[in-house]
């Protein structure tokens, strides 16, 4: 996969691309990440990327020209692919695991990271394929949001995680929150690991994990259960918890 990031603050990405899983993914050629300062594509001596909005109003808007030209430049470097051009924007579709899995199937992603009051609307209408938000709050720019999406996508690529099952069993990947985890020692200052995890009975352990995953979802994110295909056993567990309230 190729990921291009367009930002007027490219140095923000050096820590993300130079450490942990993303660094290893780049070194192992599972993904290539290139960060471009789209100010370099702004016309004029001063390379201005923002301007006042027509009709007045607070703040400045990112101009269409530098971003259009920067996107075209990264497309020209990889003409054999048709990239998803992703605009990081609080008005976009809420990012979730399903979207991460969808993006992970692509060959080329281009992230546009904005600043100031917003974007010239022609960028939305004629350039981007996806508008993505990471939540109902406002950040200084789109860079942190792009880092979150990029991290979530890269870890899903084949060969990136040491254990291929890790991404599959994470919270949200199955539609439910992940079950609790424990490691050694079995007794830490009187706080003990559930006996069933020490039993060696894999069938019991899997059922315990399934039940705890459902319980955690029921208690913390009941909205996720609205369209979840519950088994008869899971329905019984939910009824037990509901009746005990």
Swiss-Prot record:
GO CC, alphabetical: cytosol
Chemical reaction(s) catalysed: guanosine(37) in tRNA + S-adenosyl-L-methionine = N(1)-methylguanosine(37) in tRNA + S-adenosyl-L-homocysteine + H(+)
Subcellular location: Cytoplasm
Record text on subunit structure and interactions: Homodimer.
CDD domains xrefs: TrmD-like
Family: Belongs to the RNA methyltransferase TrmD family.
The organism of origin for this protein: Listeria innocua serovar 6a (strain ATCC BAA-680 / CLIP 11262)
Name of this chain's protein: tRNA (guanine-N(1)-)-methyltransferase
Superkingdom, taxonomy of origin: Bacteria
Function: Specifically methylates guanosine-37 in various tRNAs.
EC assignment: 2.1.1.228
